[in-house]
Every structure is written in C-alpha cells, then in structure tokens.
C-alpha cells in the first residue's frame, strides 16, 4: 500500500542506520559525555516506537508484555519512555545497557512497527485519535510521523555523538569507514 510504504521505508532507514552505528560501539562510548549519552538515546528511540505503536494498535507494549523492562533492569512503567518530564539528568546519567540489548529491543519494536504498518489502510491512517489536548485532533498518520521524527532525531544524535567521541566532532570523512557514521 502506497500510504504505508513511505513510512516503512523511513522506519527501515532508522533501523539500518542504528544497526550500523551501534555495531562496533564500546561500553564506554554508550555513556560518554556529552549528555544524553548514546545508550539512553538508543533506548528512548525504541521506547517511543514501542509505546506509540502499542497504543495505536491497541496492544500491550513489548516493554511490559515481552519483559524488556526486566531485561533493562527498569520498572515496567508504560508511561516511561524517556520524556524529559519523566527522566532526570541523574537517571539519564546512570542508564546502562549493552549495544546487544539495545539492538535486540529495537529489533523487536521495529518488527512490530513493520507488521503494524503492513496492516494499515488509508482509512486507518485518517482515523482521528481521542486526544483533545491537541487541536486539530491528530490522526494515526500524524502520530506515526511524530514517532518517525523522534526516531530520526534520536538516531541523528546517536550518529553525531559517535563521531564526536571518535573523531572530536562531525568529521565522518576522516573516519576509516565513513559509511559507519551515516
């Protein structure tokens, strides 16, 4: 379906880029200054996808239902997806997760996103959400674009921070493998 192909393409780009960026990341780089660190940003990217797709699809979050919260050593709180209003600077600073755990959770959220997008019709995308705090009321398509915006922003921050830590700034042309910073 044309309406969802563009969204699937965009989410696939985030998926592939996150895999390239985290493939050879070290534990020290996941928590290195400046903040927020790469590890927390990668976690947040996946949490935002998980929480929003679960709500849109009327399903339980993978974070809770599939035990990801426990694997991360965190409470299974459905509203905890890294909003600045819920995470303090200290909580972000002490966040720890391996690249493998971050990618495993992201893989699960990506697969759910992909499966969900493949089921949507034009009518589904046009459905208004019952969120009166927003005017006009957002549609499913608008929400998915918001989730995509967050994912792309977080992935861009992750890619920048990797270059910052390894090269002293955004100079991918100086890297041995410039594609690993794309």
Segments from the language model and where they lie:
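Acidic/histidine-rich alpha-helical segments that form the ligand environment
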Residues: 77-127, 142-149
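Active-site rim elements
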Residues: 1-8, 30, 96-103
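An acidic intrinsically disordered interaction segment
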Residues: 7-16, 115, 119-123
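Short, contiguous alpha-helical
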Residues: 8-12, 16-19, 27-83, 130-182
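Hydrophobic alpha-helical core bundles mediating ligand binding, dimerization, or RNAP-core interactions
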Residues: 11, 15-18, 22, 106-113
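A short secondary-structure junction motif
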Residues: 21, 25, 120-124, 161
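Helix N-cap and loop-to-helix transition residues
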Residues: 2, 26, 37, 88, ...
